[in-house]
């Protein structure tokens, strides 16, 4: 990874660790949970080789970026504020945006600041229009029960104890290799997930060690705080109820992705609802045999799918 440079940028009251490579039009990558800039290692090298400036920060609460202690510091407004400040510090006016659970924040970025986005490639997590009648957590509890993982992440200390009950490397092996497409309803926590006997070809012990070393140092609370701020973000986004995402968009999802199998999601994506809420949605790609972490699992295909879209602009 000798071509990847690392820096620390002051933005929005925090210090943000940023990995970047190349020069040219900027592509900003937003990682998911429980991940880091490192999840985009393949894309950074590929797009930088094609004449792009590829930028992948550790988001607030992750890796070598500051982690404010309060869950209320992890709303979409905070995260998008961090990213706008980052672009300002880097002297970048507009970016191509790419996200996974970063996808959640990428949708909000496009909702709040479409002027800063040339085009969007989002992976795994579809746009969810704000429902003014029910908060996200109440909706999840109603639909999937209290043992749904987002609900289990809410009480401070409980999820931390679950993730701390096995060594960090083992937890990453469990998490990154999940292939059960059913929504994670986990009465006994993520520690109850199966540990693979061997790693898949796309994931090395070195990769696991990188994630594990960072999270062993920081813990997982920063990541959990995104989930703990979901309802606060919902409250604060009331002015955007009914707003559309008006950015050219490509959406990519694996057919084994757990989010793709949430109740009603396939119907929303393929039945016209998604296109109504994202009117400049140009393409939906469903990748056969791929699960949630497709930017790592199917790196070459994802690289090509991203490039084929952004090169048009």
Curated annotation (Swiss-Prot):
Key word Hydrolase present: yes
Site (Contributes to the formation of an oxyanion binding site for the epoxide oxygen of substrate): 149, 227
Swiss-Prot/TrEMBL keywords: Hydrolase
EC id: 3.3.2.10, 3.3.2.-
Oligomeric and partner information: Homodimer.
UniProt similarity note: Belongs to the AB hydrolase superfamily. Epoxide hydrolase family.
Protein's UniProt name: Epoxide hydrolase 1
Organism: Siraitia grosvenorii
């Amino acid at each position: 990874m000798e071509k990847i440079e690392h820096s620390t940028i002051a933005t929005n009251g925090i210090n943000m660790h940023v990995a970047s490579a190349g020069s040219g039009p900027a592509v900003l990558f937003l990682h998911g949970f429980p991940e880091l800039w490192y999840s985009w290692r393949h894309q950074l090298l590929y797009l930088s080789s094609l004449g792009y400036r590829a930028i992948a920060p550790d988001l607030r609460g992750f890796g070598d970026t500051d982690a404010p202690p309060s869950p209320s510091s992890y709303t979409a407004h905070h995260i998008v504020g961090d990213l706008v400040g980052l672009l300002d510090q880097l002297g970048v006016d507009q970016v191509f945006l790419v996200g996974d659970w970063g996808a959640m924040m990428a949708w909000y970025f496009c909702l709040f600041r479409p002027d800063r986005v040339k085009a969007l490639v989002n992976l795994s997590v579809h746009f969810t229009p704000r429902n003014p009648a029910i908060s996200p957590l109440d909706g999840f509890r109603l639909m999937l029960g209290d043992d749904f993982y987002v609900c289990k992440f809410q009480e401070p200390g409980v999820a931390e104890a679950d993730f701390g009950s096995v060594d960090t490397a083992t937890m990453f092996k469990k998490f990154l290799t999940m292939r059960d497409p059913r929504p994670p309803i986990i009465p006994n926590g993520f520690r109850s997930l199966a540990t693979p006997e061997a790693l898949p070809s796309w994931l090395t012990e070195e990769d696991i060690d990188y994630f594990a070393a960072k999270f062993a140092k920081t813990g997982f609370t920063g990541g959990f705080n995104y989930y703990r701020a979901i309802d606060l973000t919902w409250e604060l986004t009331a002015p955007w109820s009914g707003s559309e995402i008006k950015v050219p968009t490509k959406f990519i999802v694996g057919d084994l992705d757990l989010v793709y199998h949430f109740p009603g999601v396939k119907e929303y994506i393929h039945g016209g609802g998604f296109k109504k809420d994202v009117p400049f949605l140009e393409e939906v790609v469903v990748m056969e045999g791929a699960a949630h972490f497709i930017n790592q699992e199917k790196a070459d295909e994802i690289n090509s799918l991203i490039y084929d879209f952004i090169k048009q602009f």
